[in-house]
């Protein structure tokens, strides 16, 4: 029983085939072309190579990537890979691949992967966070992604930093056209900008920049707890590798939660940067063996 998935990222595209136990039967990567049509062709070539490695044909493909298609028009919106916006990306992928495609936001793929057999396995409601070049959130409920009526559930990175201090208002300009989005405060580049040095070096120093980061991330996640109250929060993306977050974030979240108690686990994604392609593969039921 084989599933095929693609993680369409800003710098790389990865295609993979997984067996029923979630083990890789094929895995291949290539750079992300900046051109729309070249991106479609890159996905076609990577799926063909994954099929060759797995010795199986993909009857359908799950795709995870930035943004999401509008339920009203089918056109992409909210993608930081801006060449996708206002284009019928899922439909064009179906045309190029010649088979059905399911597309989901990459944060929803993270949530699905981790809820299935990762750090969120066994929890009913999983809120998964990407803290990388960009910032996003995804929700899985009872092992299935929650998209919402407008297919924007979990778009946490483009909500404002809660309870901003005077020096944080109105906040840095965001590519989406607003100011003060959480992405501009808790992404990897935002942390590096605030620290005045590379994110890894600043995290290793464990100084004021990291304290500010934990405070801002805690405020942002407290709003999620008040609205969704997930059973677990799973962190992915480059900043999830900062080990100090897991000791400090609960204390950064708790004062802002509208409750006298807060005990939600904050865990690191088990599958790391494989979660995107794994979650994309899990978007479809398994395919029978050839």
Model-inferred region functions:
Residues 24, 76, 145-146:
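Hydrophobic "anchor" residues
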Residues 1-61, 70-73, 90-101, 114-123, ...:
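ATP-binding/phosphotransfer module of carbohydrate and carboxylate kinases, centering on a glycine-rich
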Residues 123-182:
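Glycine-rich phosphate-binding loop of actin/hexokinase-like ATP-binding domains
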Residues 7, 62-66, 104, 128-134, ...:
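Short beta-strand segments
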Residues 27-29, 79, 148:
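Residue-level detector of high-confidence beta-strand sites
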Residues 103-107, 111:
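Short loop/edge segments at beta-strand edges and connector loops
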Residues 74-86:
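A charged helix-plus-loop insertion that forms the helical arch/lid used to bind
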Residues 31-34, 60, 84, 148, ...:
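A short acidic/small-residue loop/turn micro-motif
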